[in-house]
Amino acid sequence: MKTDLILNIETSTSNCSVSLSKGKNLIDLIEIDNSSYSHSENLHTFIYQILNSNKFSSEDLGCVSVSRGPGSYTGLRIGVSAAKGLCFANDIPLVSVSSLEILANSSNFNGIIIPTIDARRDEVYSSAFFQSNMISKEKPEIIVSESFIEYLKNNNIIIVGNGQFKCEKIIKK
């Protein structure tokens, strides 16, 4: 790796975000949450802005990290295509990260974290993590009142992500 400067791209949901990090330290973040999923209009502009405003170019990157889903198929294609183009042009590695893992690691909760991504209708993509370790498989799931029953007994849990309200309504029944 040329440097430890990482460009992170997330386009799996209605949120389009680009961030720069050095090692584990976040340098900058640009994001927009737009229900019209206008990632193709924003992503390349965000990449240019974040690099330019921090006095970097794509040649300074050590790698690019991109969300691999689950999530919006079109959003994922846009993010992965941009990431692959940058990596190919600069001969740097591409790292893919689970969208659910990104959500789980954004919380400092001491207990079981259930990241969710709305999959439309009555479905969400979900998984379960304990202290950054996945304890259940990523899967699309039709939410029913028993969906997370194995985690609700004697555990502190938090449900995060844009599918959380759908889960909360059904689980409380």
Where do the language-model regions lie?
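Surface "functional belts" at beta-alpha junctions
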Residues: 2, 35, 93-173
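Residue-level signal for well-ordered, solvent-exposed loop/turn and beta-edge residues enriched
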Residues: 25, 72, 133-134
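Short, basic/glycine-rich phosphate-binding loops at helix/coil junctions
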Residues: 25-27, 80-86, 123-130
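Short amphipathic alpha-helical face segments that pack within enzyme cores
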Residues: 42-45, 81, 85, 102
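Phosphate-handling active-site elements
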Residues: 53-59, 88-99
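DPxDG-like acidic metal-binding loop motif
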Residues: 63-94
